[in-house]
């Protein structure tokens, strides 16, 4: 079953922009050809990731199973 929808061109541009943004690309332009094809010009956005600081000693101490102490 094929579902066809009539979308406005600016709505299509918005959908394409969100799709590529989710994949880490920046859309520069969207060109429409006469045969209905779209040419999307994108650029990979370099994500600046901060190195996560992990306190190894703290992590190690708190991952050990705790011994339960029972009062007699």
Curated annotation (Swiss-Prot):
It comes from the Bacteria. This is SPbeta prophage-derived uncharacterized protein YoqN.
